[in-house]
A protein has these predicted regions:
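Flexible "cap/lid" subdomain of the alpha/beta-hydrolase fold that forms the substrate-access gate
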Residues: 2-3, 14-16, 26, 62-98, ...
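Catalytic histidine-centered segment of alpha/beta-hydrolase-like enzymes
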Residues: 252-261, 265
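Conserved HGGG/HGGXW glycine-rich cap/lid loop of the alpha/beta-hydrolase fold
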Residues: 17-66
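A short, glycine- and basic residue-enriched loop/turn
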Residues: 36-37, 105, 252-253
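PAS and PAS-like sensory modules
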Residues: 6-7
């Protein structure tokens, strides 16, 4: 991570650690599981060098941010409220939003319910919430059932020096960073609460209608993503009223910001200009 301002911002009864760098057109980067703002270490200096004001929070439950105990605190509506509150705290009316994994779900919903706060949207890996689940997608989400079992999931993931986590990610991602972050007291449970609050089998699906996304939207999927079916991202343009563009990155894993930083940076710069 480049030198800059890392600070705590109080929002919605919790404290979020936020990386705040540069000046210019604002870009808000939202990570997913099991990451933190550190996921964006290749994007932050690049965007700052091209004249952008870059903001990257550790979302609630991750990194150095607060870990609410109540599972319901991790509902997506609260994460969306956090995004709006971060913009308020920084005195920003609107920003470009970039989201990966759970962060993509958060940015989709922010664009739907706070359209005036989103200039342009970039979603990595995760399709629009209304995109129908294919049978392949249902198979790929097997791990989300494990994550529902409090205590059992934590023990499984940590067993034998976090062997499950290493195997699950197939050698991709930030293993040592994840393990260091998730080893802090309460951190692993807090991170899994995103799944318990939003992806439990007993929960109803998204409502039959959601507001259309009016912001210009770029959807990016990578061919070695073992958790998301690319067909769903490709077809997400049906839920976007504004300009839509789909890009596929060959050979990259689920963690596009790490596996294809140069290509992602290229796409971001082109989209935001």
């Amino acid at each position: 991570m480049m030198q800059g301002r890392g600070r705590m911002i109080d929002v919605n009864g919790i404290s979020l650690h936020v990386e705040d760098h540069g000046a210019g057109d604002p870009v808000l980067l939202i990570h997913g599981w099991p990451d933190s703002a550190f996921l964006w270490r290749n994007q932050i200096p690049f965007l700052v060098s091209h004249g952008f004001h870059v903001i990257a929070p550790d979302m609630r439950g991750f990194g150095r941010s607060s870990q609410p105990e109540d599972v319901a605190a991790y509902a997506l509506r609260n994460a969306v409220a956090d995004v709006a509150a971060i913009l308020d705290a920084l005195g920003l009316d609107a920003a470009h939003l970039v989201g990966h994994d759970w962060g993509a779900a958060v940015t989709w919903l922010t664009a739907m319910f706070h359209p005036g706060r989103v200039r342009k949207l970039v979603v990595l890996s995760v399709p629009h919430p209304r995109s129908p689940h294919t049978m392949r997608q249902k198979e790929m989400f097997w791990y989300q059932l494990l994550f529902q079992f409090a205590g059992i999931a934590e023990a499984t993931i940590q067993h034998d020096n976090w062997a499950w986590l290493r195997a699950f990610s197939r050698g991709d991602g930030d293993h040592e960073r994840w393990i260091a972050d998730l080893s802090r007291p309460g951190a692993l449970t807090a991170s899994l609460n995103w799944y318990r609050a939003n992806a439990a089998p007993r929960m109803p699906g998204p409502p039959p209608t959601l507001p259309q996304v009016t912001a210009p939207t770029l959807g990016i999927w990578s061919t070695n993503d073992y958790y998301l079916d690319g067909v769903r991202m490709e077809e997400s343009g049906a839920y976007v009223e504004g300009p839509w563009r789909y890009e596929q990155i060959a050979g990259a894993s689920h963690w596009i910001p790490l596996d294809a930083p140069d290509r992602l940076n290229e796409l971001l710069l082109d989209w935001f200009r």
